[in-house]
């Protein structure tokens, strides 16, 4: 389509290359100079007068003014994978810088030698294995230490009482560290006394278990507390000849529990330990309980001939109340034993066979508790007790004696007894005051000779190192695992159908289990007084008494008459442990 448009006083001819002719307007796309006067093959005449109304904003485009092409989009220089890797790397670097500068701190500078020399000897610490000998010749890491120096030595200040109190934030520094008349003085602590409610609960549970076990084993002829007391009271080596057989008629283990309170830790002077030793003092009170023992016997007149006259005697002794102050302290292992807290010398010419025989003889006594004193040497003519045999076995087995717990009562204790007596056969005398005084004085002397200061009782602490031989499972899975042989510890539970016997299963390095019949009689063990060694050599409880220390008696109907005679021979050993009468056997679960 050609037309002439006056522009700035000149005539120019334009041609519309593209035109779209709707009913009321013309859409112009672009202009270019041309001489053609056709639009889509048809002649078209353009009216110049209509141009301003149709194209109010149209501007002429000359030949030298063409439309510029649109700018091309800039392509990224990195691909998507490269950008992802760069982003991940930057995040890792940021996290690493945060951990290094905000979480980890700088290494502390090495301690200066001037600071070490300025410290006193009591506060100087060892920073290496050879700190004493390597102050001027430090050892490099490439040097291999000797075998004896692998375990770091314990500083001498670690066992000091002041160091222990300082590290545990306990104020028990003695106000007057002097002694009087060569005896150690008890210094009061500035720390507030502590209540022992949690300790009372633990002690009550322990005593309740002892009472329950003693009642469970009441029908056993060998392991019951009745049999143990009868054997102890009728010991021919200690019972006088003018006393007939003593028969126990009544035993009551009580129903109440002792209450401990007002616990305080004090520092006590001890010339044999550096810095003294620590001692825990606690008040104990037991009242309104029913601890009683009743016996019957006869006094024999053996002159001018044996059994010339017989006088029946019945006694009943009850503990009405006991109160006192209990002292507890720990005794280091290398310098002590279960018999004395000082070194005990034995005759050099004493043979092993004689010692073993005396140990076996004294083991049968069982109930006699020897006197324990501080730094008291054992006489050369005294025979070792069962505790000494046990300690000797422990010393040979583990190399050094174990650490012990020493406990005693202060002299200001209170022990109230009630003694009832009945003397005579036909015309009886009841509750004779003189008899009550004699019995009460004898009981007081017996108690003071054993557990009243300065005499103490020393008990070896058990080994609490975790072992598979002592591993058990709580709940109802015990019996299932014992049958399947999964556990390696005797899992002992009481008999079900009215049975008082025990059953178990040995495993690992244990010494086998015990399984009793429905009545608890005929067991192949000596119950509460003597028990085979728990660490037998292969006693896995296969058949009766096979293996060292292993005893196994099936509780089935076909094996109810199998006693401990079949297994007592190989199961009994010379190092059997002595147990308190009425105490629980190993691993007895009461339901």
From Swiss-Prot:
InterPro entries named among the record's database cross-references: Mmm1, MMM1_dom, SMP_LBD
Comp. bias (Basic residues): 180-189
Record's compositionally biased regions (Low complexity): 379-389
Cellular localisation: Endoplasmic reticulum membrane
Bias-annotated ranges (Polar residues): 146-159, 170-179, 336-371
Stretches the record annotates as Disordered: 138-159, 170-189, 334-398, 479-591
GO molecular function, one term: lipid binding
Keyword Membrane among record annotations: yes
Domain notes: The SMP-LTD domain is a barrel-like domain that can bind various types of glycerophospholipids in its interior and mediate their transfer between two adjacent bilayers.
The name this protein goes by in its record: Maintenance of mitochondrial morphology protein 1
Provenance organism: Ajellomyces capsulatus (strain G186AR / H82 / ATCC MYA-2454 / RMSCC 2432)
Gene that this polypeptide is encoded by: MMM1
